[in-house]
Amino acid sequence: MKKIYDLWVRVSLIKKIGIGVVIGVMLGILAPDLTGFSILGKLFVGGLKAIAPLLVFALVSQAISHQKKGKQTNMTLIIVLYLFGTFASALVAVLTAYLFPLTLVLNTPVNTELSPPQGVAEVFQSLLLKLVDNPINALATANYIGVLSWAIIFGLALKAASKETKHLIKTAAEVTSQIVVWIINLAPIGIMSLVFTTISENGVGILSDYAFLILVLVGTMLFVALVVNPLIAVLITRQNPYPLVLRCLRESGLTAFFTRSSAANIPVNMQLCQKIGLSKDTYSVSIPLGATINMGGAAITINVLTLAAVHTFGIPIDFLTALLLSVVAAVSACGASGVAGGSLLLIPVACSLFGISNDLAMQVVGVGFIVGVIQDSCETALNSSTDVLFTAIAENAFWKRKKA
């Protein structure tokens, strides 16, 4: 028994989730009457629902409070590229959702009533009101817009705090992240239960829907990595970007694909920047910063799954509302850094714009975890490789201006 336990501990989480998916499918086909097994999935999603608001608040406030004043480098352009790249990724995801509309199979209660917004004006009004919600109430009711706004305000206020206070905030963020890690480590069991419930209630044919969802997610990320990012690079450097793009994907993206953490890939990215010959004063700041705010892959995940939920519930959406969703997704994605599956936990932020309840949004998160074996790896690979790419092209443009 101990040997089995030791073997299980040594197996990576991504392999455990894969095993869980296979077992869940088999149980759903062979023993669909084990309805009590569904409670494990409900407990897993419940744990995520409980910790998600606190996670967003802790990470965002800690990140803002610890930001340092940049040296005389090209950090301004890098930050602009990070933010623009994340927004561009979110916008591409919206366009993809229009071209390839998805629907999800969710356990929607019969008496569920949705309150879809009537155009962008109502969405914007709702957004403003949520911004000023009581911070305690925002955490308790999972008002993620309010949580984000208060986290930013607290982070800015804490910039002037003592080192001891900042250390306490950092410790609180680390503790919250550790709790999330513990919950995420239960993902194989939770996902096994979620897959079992889905198969036992809807049949094997439901897997084709998830296959299409994976194809849309991965296809969108590949389009951003191989078309959008090179286009941005061409506009900045006026040079063929593909040798650099492919090197970043090969030497940074490949490692990030398996670690599934932008934060864990920081040393790899710094070593790559050194190999390329970039300034240490620049990349020592830009790479850790990119692991926090350069979240194009996360923005894609948030938008694709949110709009899939919108299509599932038949909620009408105009282009201006979709544009606002892109902005919200880009801002929300900044809170996903360094946490496995972090982008999935931020889907309720975007869902709340369309009157989708937190309970239903967390079901969408559950779907995200089922496809997360591939989605999270591809997302992290895109996020982390783009950190090096944008740092390199910004420095290239910086030295061109110096020579001119």
Curated annotation (Swiss-Prot):
Molecular function terms, GO-annotated: amino acid transmembrane transporter activity; symporter activity
GO cellular component assignments: plasma membrane
Tree of life domain: Bacteria
Subcellular location: Cell membrane
Keyword Cell membrane carried by entry: yes
Keyword terms, alphabetized: Amino-acid transport, Cell membrane, Membrane, Symport, Transmembrane, Transmembrane helix, Transport
A Pfam match: SDF
UniProt GO BP: serine transport; threonine transport
Protein topology in the membrane: Multi-pass membrane protein
Segments passing through the bilayer: 17-37, 39-59, 75-95, 138-158, 179-199, 212-232, 287-307, 313-333
Catalytic activity of the protein: L-serine(in) + Na(+)(in) = L-serine(out) + Na(+)(out); L-threonine(in) + Na(+)(in) = L-threonine(out) + Na(+)(out)
Listed Gene3D superfamilies: Sodium:dicarboxylate symporter (1.10.3860.10)
Primary role: Involved in the import of serine and threonine into the cell, with the concomitant import of sodium (symport system).
Family named by the database record: Belongs to the dicarboxylate/amino acid:cation symporter (DAACS) (TC 2.A.23) family.
HAMAP family reported for this sequence: Ser_Thr_transp_SstT
Protein name: Serine/threonine transporter SstT
Organism of derivation: Streptococcus pyogenes serotype M1
